[in-house]
A protein has these predicted regions:
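Short, surface-exposed beta-strand/strand-loop-strand elements in extracellular ectodomains
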Residues: 66-89
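A short beta-strand element within beta-rich, extracytoplasmic domains
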Residues: 53-64, 115
Length: 137
């Protein structure tokens, strides 16, 4: 990875995932697509582009189910490979509830941020909204 030199851009951006879970995809990972404003189906691994560093500012997760709470996992696959690094594991979100993760963290080129609903249920319907700073050098 190149070292930032002072030239380049720093832009505030956002992306989202809608319909996470939806029963059929229980326990399947959905990846954030940094080049898209919204992911509405299970995406293959979408990684941070070369010559970019992303600072995640906040992650807002909303459970749209009217009847059930669901546990959510949030994790990072690092460019160096190895094990999945969990940032949230079985974080329970009440029905019609919202969870806000506002600890900052950094993603480097080839890292991937991913989410999954960690419970088998047909009524899960979760939205994820991610705001971040994209530093391109």
């Amino acid at each position: 990875m190149a070292i930032p030199t002072g030239a380049g851009t720093e832009v505030l951006k956002r992306t989202s995932i809608t319909g996470l879970g939806a029963g059929a995809t229980y326990a399947d990972w959905w990846h954030v697509d940094w080049a898209s404003e919204e992911v509405s189906s299970q995406a293959a691994s979408a990684v941070v582009a070369a010559d970019h560093i992303l600072t995640i500012i906040s992650v807002i997760i909303c459970n749209q189910s009217v009847s059930y709470s669901f546990p959510i996992d949030m994790a990072v696959d690092t460019a160096s490979g190895g094990n999945t690094q969990f940032l949230l594991y079985d974080q329970d979100i009440a029905s019609k509830g919202t969870f806000i993760f506002n600890d900052r963290f950094v993603l480097h080129p080839a890292d991937a941020l991913k989410f999954r609903v960690n419970k088998d249920a047909s009524g899960d319907n979760t939205s994820v909204y991610v705001s971040f700073i994209d530093q391109h050098f």
